[in-house]
């Protein structure tokens, strides 16, 4: 018991936070991240709760995606973050809601600007740092949307997306670059369809515009304008 008490006393007296090192940040400053964590210089390094700090970061700084917090003895706390860089816009009742490919609402805006638009859906009770939710009857469209956004991100194709349309109950369509409308089914293998899309575009003349139909399994079709 004496040894345990001495160990606890040592942890309390020593290992005070003298510096907080933040890496991976661009949108938020290191000080903003430290403040959001709730860490102050002089706090005990071992009495800080890492799960609580991660939760506060996600709640207070919506663009934070992944967080890794480590202790570096004797007195440094390291916070490594990744931030969401691609967002999409849903316009609803005069407000533009910006959301990530993972379905997190990160910001509101008065105007959409050049952010890719998602239409044909309605957000239920949207709130900052909250998760996107569609009406129950649109759950299939919601799941398909975020499966597509995840696939676009993995394929590094997000920069060419101009808009995604969910208004048609049978076909999900996407405005891609300034040249194409891409038609896809809901609940599809989107990584595979995006590979088809890339191959089709590579075969087309650079001045062609039109519709790329990916709704027929394994048989892409191009309809020129």
Predicted regions span which residues?
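Periplasmic polypeptide-binding modules associated with outer-membrane biogenesis and secretion
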Residues: 3-7, 15-26, 46-99, 146-149
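Extracytoplasmic segments of membrane-associated envelope/inner-membrane machinery
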Residues: 82-161
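Short beta-strands and strand-coil junctions in structured, solvent-facing domains, enriched
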Residues: 42-44, 65-66, 75-76, 85-88, ...
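Soluble extracytoplasmic domains of inner/organellar membrane proteins
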Residues: 137-192, 198
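Envelope-exposed proteins and targeting segments
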Residues: 16-18, 29, 53, 60-65, ...
